[in-house]
Amino acid sequence: MTDSGDLCPHLDSIGEVTKEELIQKSKGTCQSCGVGGPNLWACLQCDCPYVGCGESYSDHSTIHAQAKKHNLTVNLTTFRVWCYVCEREVFLEPKPVTPVSSAHRCKPHDQDPVSQTTCYPLKAVPIAVADEEGSESEEDELKPRGLTGMKNIGNSCYMNAALQALSNCPPLTQFFQDCSGLVRTDKKPALCKSYQKLISELWHKKRPSYVVPTTLFHGIKLVNPMFRGYAQQDTQEFLRCLMDQLHEELKEPLFDCSGGISEVEPDLSLDSCNLVDGDRSPSEDEFLSCDSGSGSERGDGERAGGEAELLIQDECVAVRGTGGISEKERLKERRGEERTREMDEDADVDTAAQDGQAERETETATPATAVPAPGNTEPDNEASMHCPSSRPCSPAHSVQELHSRLSSNPPRSSPLRTGPTYTFKKAQMLLSTKKKKQSRFRSVISDIFDGSILSLVQCLTCDRVSTTVETFQDLSLPIPGKEDLAKLHSSIHQSAPVKAGVCTDGYAAQGWISYIMDSIRRFVVSCIPSWFWGPMVTLEDCLAAFFAADELKGDNMYSCERCKKLRNGVKYCKVLRLPEILCIHLKRFRHEVMYSFKINSHVSFPLEGLDLKPFLAKESPSQITTYDLLSVICHHGTAGSGHYIAYCQNVINGQWYEFDDQYVTEVHETVVQNAEAYVLFYRKSSEESVRERQRVVALANLKEPSLLQFYISREWLNKFNTFTEPGPITNHTFLCQHGGIPPTKYHYVDDLVVILPQNVWEYLYNRFGGGPAVNHLYVCAICQVEIETLAKRRKLEIDTFIKLNKEFQAEEAPTVILCISMQWFREWENFVKGKDNEPPGPIDNSKIAVMKGGHIQLKQGADYGQISEETWQYLLSIYGGGPEIAVRQTISPPDTDTHGERKIEAETRAL
């Protein structure tokens, strides 16, 4: 409860006012300028009926208060009370809030945090680093934060709902709050900085009523032109684009156990359990491969006065911000403030991998996509019709090589494709020795959201099994119909796999008449409530449909390498590694040739205890398989128009809230369970991880004197605080491969490390392994020399190129002009300008060359540049490669025709 000393002394000036009166006033306008709501302010002075606008307009409420000496005012949207004299929010009636069956407007000041925590305990409340400054009382910390709305800035509800759902994912939010020193990038538009600022505003202790995410909105438009303008977009496509860009800006090279930078491994085997993570960098191709590993994710703690101290507490106090916005609070601020790879010797991959390997290795930026259901490759929403994108690879870690894995991109279907058409060919990607060395990368995004699926295709003639591992960031699940449910339930009872193309037969090839009739039937059915025409569909049914076996026959026959011809086959998949946060996307949108429609079937989903063990591969290293719901995004409307909202569970008090743009409303959990889910976020749950953190807290509180103090990665410690499976300690977030501090990180190393007492370090090291142990921080001299050498090399190469190119431009008629691939040249340019730390591989002109008549010629429409012969020879001497392609060559002068001269001379002699 609020201490008596904290009560505002001006509360006596309030007259009698009821909630009904305030609601009635909220429907009015400002009495000075006539502007309407939201966020009008009503004067609470006795017998004063004044209603004025807030700071978002002319702030007539403040002008009225200063002129009339009226101290208290209430926001008619959030019902929060502000005192102008005390310059702070005040609380009228602190009392517990009991669960209600209907939604009511959220009033954080009316909630007793103690009773809330008691009545609604979280299943897994992680421990987080405490606020060292102690600026907030324990009671204030337990009051819910994060209940801040977002203003709709032009059909932006799809963005607002997605951001609110992400904001209520504690591992991600706490990273941006507590590991702000790691949010550094020189990549435009620096979306991670915009997102970090937004998170700090949403979770600020001053609890603003709403914010305007303008900066992030502009940034996402720069990343993907699809979001420009003010048309309604798909929230799932926005999520993929945002998270992919955050990964690109925050990714770091992954170090292997020996301390070196981990690179692409050409020979990997599933049997050895040496599964390697994929780099999440995106690609334009369908089934491309890349590698990445996992690393540590977050750390926390502070260094203060040289004392070794580990401050940890419940997660409910972990989410805090550094900047404030909103209306009356500003008065107070004026005073202060994956590689797809063969897993057996005969493993196959999609032929798209051959053409796309170079693009994957240069990490072209494209939004990520979800793993498609084996039996359903139809586009699932509007955005997928316009912006087909590929799946990036990503990492994960564990003590027994838990974090190693193969990864690849799943096939992305054509909009008019009615079934999976897989064309497999022998993998060739790793056979070329001329490729640039590729480091593997990880980021907080890949650590939290990336999982992997083991896909197997079996030839039914020779029984050969081809195995691949696909990295996913979200699972796009089909919604089975009545017939599909019958097949699924039948297969469950019979303990046999479904081989009938679950959820796809209804969309298979058919005649025009039957196609039109079936389309009309499905359109009519989609307009009827699901309870009228179909059985209850559960999320487990959707998962079963996704993982059901799919026959490859007819037009979708499997090209078997052993048989050397098309054969009937069967494809099925299992989860190889579960992500910390599982994002599930229900495919509610269908796009036919002539129209689009939405599947309005209600899909029931559990708030707690979603178990994925039935869908886990036997090779999976994942130990924890149960999930609890964090947030759910809902779409109301049709395929052509509608509105997005989000339901999220507040991590502080365990209550559920509806986020509808700038309005935040507390709701009962039954409202959430009855929602028409579109995107769901589930988090791994484990009581053991909570007890693990409690043991560390107890060790830290012992304050045993120790002769040695250990530095640990702030990122990994934060990961320990928020993950159920944090993996081995990884101190290479602040160490180089030589064991020192990279010169580029030394000036902000305090933001990257936390000092632990010896007993805490020993417990964590014995429990999780990893390392290395660090007792002293020093700048790495080897890295310093390498940086200086690299700088000299860059300067020499760019100066020489500029000199040779000037000479080339000065030539009026150069005898020889050679071509160079602009793709390779851009890589080289990024290297010499310092944008890329790794030099490019050998010159690769293969994509701009074509063989004609036994001679290499320039391919028509190729992306190339023209350079002089001297420039070509200079670059060739450094990087090698080829082939040489000339657009103008030296023409030898023709032999002089002396026959005519001799004839004239002979005739002259004859005369």
Curated annotation (Swiss-Prot):
Biased composition (Basic and acidic residues): 297-306, 327-342
List of catalytic residues: 157, 643
SUPFAM superfamilies assigned to the protein according to its UniProt record, in alphabetical order: Cysteine proteinases (SSF54001), DUSP-like (SSF143791), RING/U-box (SSF57850)
Family annotation (SMART domains): DUSP, ZnF_UBP
Subcellular location: Cytoplasm, Perinuclear region; Cytoplasm, Cytoskeleton, Microtubule organizing center, Centrosome
Residues annotated as binding Zn(2+) 2: 30, 33, 53, 60
PROSITE patterns per UniProt: DUSP, USP_1, USP_2, USP_3, ZF_UBP
CDD domains: Peptidase_C19R
Protein's GO biological process: central nervous system morphogenesis; cranial skeletal system development; endocytosis; nervous system development; protein deubiquitination; protein K48-linked deubiquitination; protein K63-linked deubiquitination; proteolysis
Enzyme class (EC, first level): hydrolase
Binding-site residues for Zn(2+) 1, renumbered to this chain: 8, 10, 83, 86
Keyword ATP-binding: no
Chief location: cytoplasm
Domain DUSP: 687-780, 789-891
Reactions accelerated catalytically: Thiol-dependent hydrolysis of ester, thioester, amide, peptide and isopeptide bonds formed by the C-terminal Gly of ubiquitin (a 76-residue protein attached to proteins as an intracellular targeting signal)
Function: Deubiquitinating enzyme involved in beta-2 adrenergic receptor (adrb2) recycling. Acts as a regulator of G-protein coupled receptor (GPCR) signaling by mediating the deubiquitination beta-2 adrenergic receptor (adrb2). Plays a central role in adrb2 recycling and resensitization after prolonged agonist stimulation by constitutively binding adrb2, mediating deubiquitination of adrb2 and inhibiting lysosomal trafficking of adrb2. Mediates deubiquitination of both 'Lys-48'- and 'Lys-63'-linked polyubiquitin chains.
Name of the protein in its database record: Ubiquitin carboxyl-terminal hydrolase 20
Organism: Danio rerio
Gene from which the chain derives: usp20
